[in-house]
Amino acid sequence: MSSVLKAYERFTLTQELQDQSEEGTIPPTTLKPVIRVFILTSNNPELRSRLLLFCLRIVLSNGARDSHRFGALLTMFSLPSATMLNHVKLADQSPEADIERVEIDGFEEGSFRLIPNARSGMSRGEINAYAALAEDLPDTLNHATPFVDSEVEGTAWDEIETFLDMCYSVLMQAWIVTCKCMTAPDQPAASIEKRLQKYRQQGRINPRYLLQPEARRIIQNVIRKGMVVRHFLTFELQLARAQSLVSNRYYAMVGDVGKYIENCGMGGFFLTLKYALGTRWPTLALAAFSGELTKLKSLMALYQTLGEQARYLALLESPHLMDFAAANYPLLYSYAMGIGYVLDVNMRNYAFSRSYMNKTYFQLGMETARKQQGAVDMRMAEDLGLTQAERTEMANTLAKLTTANRGADTRGGVNPFSSVTGTTQVPAAATGDTLESYMAADRLRQRYADAGTHDDEMPPLEEEEEDDTSAGPRTGPTLEQVALDIQNAAVGAPIHTDDLNAALGDLDI
């Protein structure tokens, strides 16, 4: 029997890896569009600024084809490079399109008519067509300009610093909308605004060069549709990761925003590793977890085998992303979410409810977390030289704090900023500490939260923890009032979905 079990473990470990092709294998050739990328051999800031504005207008143009938009975006992302011709070669690595480079010498005075290099081979008709596309902006853009400030395009770009300021500001906004272009393209505007505010505070985005929301939405859709563009951006992210601490400003910004893109769509996998395996609590010894533990072991091996590009499976539209779905290990996932719900306040922004969520193991995770919060890691205690009395004192102190504050916070944590004036705290034991009550609260948060609540999305970083709401006035009951009503209604009776919907009926969201 033991030989069969060992064979099963080996089979599970190799099953994830057997479909992997050899490194560098070229996929079968398919029909590919020709994408025209414009190249400047001059570092003149006036020419580069004009080309950036021209390409931005092509991306937003009503009449532009997808190949026009993809080429314009690739040109924009290559403009910070001192040698555009070499930098565009990154796009040649994509099997999705053929890249045609067109060298240009400038623009006709007062227009967007290209002056192509003699070697480019562009006809007069093509030049006129591109100029017409640049002028054909959507009616949804105010003042017929992509920028919030209608006077930006009339600026004199006579210094390289001025050009770089605009270029970095525009490209950073394109990177920001790339973050969730595959996993949550309909993310609320507030989520984007938070990141914009962060980079504005850091001085990486000049407020004068802010794009209109409609312009950012169109750019996001183009990036979502263009695999060749996403391939190019992935190569840029890898370049940014390879930089030393002393890097240029652009790749420092790309590396920073890349942290939002890495492992997108794999939140369930990494949270399961963090809370189910990282805690190393005795509950993992349950026989029901054995098969799924082997599955997680094989997935960790697969992730390492995929190499650097494993971080960007969603951006690359890789089928391997499905292997990491939490539906492949539902019991461990349910158990981990129960632990995370108790331990981590950030989990309030993570929509973990799934059709395969197991109620029993979710409750098991919550109970395990509450009982084990005072447990001591023996190896760490030995490294610190703690005596048995000190270990016991630590465990007892945490147990007292947890018990005393159970009514103040549903996860057993302490909220030092909560106001208790005029508010009666209902003990957790009296509220029916059931999965239904937690799920009801989770569904309520999913409706109410404005960002970071999409499927398979990692909990937001520290700067995005606030649950911002729309600026308009609210007439209905607040979230706290509804939550308190639900909590009070739970005394003596479990919460049902119909009751929750009735409670939410007047909530102004």
UniProtKB/Swiss-Prot annotation:
**Stretch list, region Disordered:** 452-477
- Please give the Gene Ontology molecular function terms for this protein: RNA binding; structural molecule activity
Give the UniProt subcellular location, in the record's own words: Virion; Host cytoplasm
Keywords, ordered alphabetically: Capsid protein, Helical capsid protein, Host cytoplasm, Ribonucleoprotein, RNA-binding, Viral nucleoprotein, Virion
Provide the residue span(s) of the region labelled Ntail.
405-509
> What's the domain of life for this entry?
Viruses
The reply to whether Ribonucleoprotein figures as a keyword in the UniProt entry is yes
Known InterPro entries for this protein? Answer: Paramyx_ncap (IPR002021)
Offer a single GO CC term for the protein: host cell cytoplasm
Enumerate the residues binding RNA.
180, 195, 260, 350, 354
Where do Acidic residues bias regions lie? 458-469
* Ncore: annotated segments: 1-404
The record's principal subcellular location, in a coarse class, is virion
Q: Does the record's keyword annotation contain Ribonucleoprotein? A: yes
According to the record's subunit comment, the protein's assembly and interactions are: Homomultimer; forms the nucleocapsid. Binds to the viral genomic RNA. N0 interacts with the phosphoprotein (via N-terminus); this interaction allows P to chaperon N0 to avoid N polymerization before encapsidation. Interacts as N-RNA template with the phosphoprotein (via C-terminus); this interaction positions the polymerase on the template.
Q: What does this protein do?
A: Forms the helical nucleocapsid (NC), protecting the genome from nucleases. The encapsidated genomic RNA serves as template for transcription and replication; encapsidation by N is coupled to RNA synthesis. Forms the encapsidation complex with the phosphoprotein protein P. Before encapsidation, the newly synthesized free N protein, so-called N0, is chaperoned by P.
State the similarity comment. Belongs to the paramyxoviruses nucleocapsid family.
Q: What is known of its domains?
A: Ncore is globular and carries the regions required for self-assembly and RNA-binding. Ntail is an intrinsically disordered monomeric domain in the C-terminus.
What is the protein name given in its UniProt record? Answer: Nucleoprotein
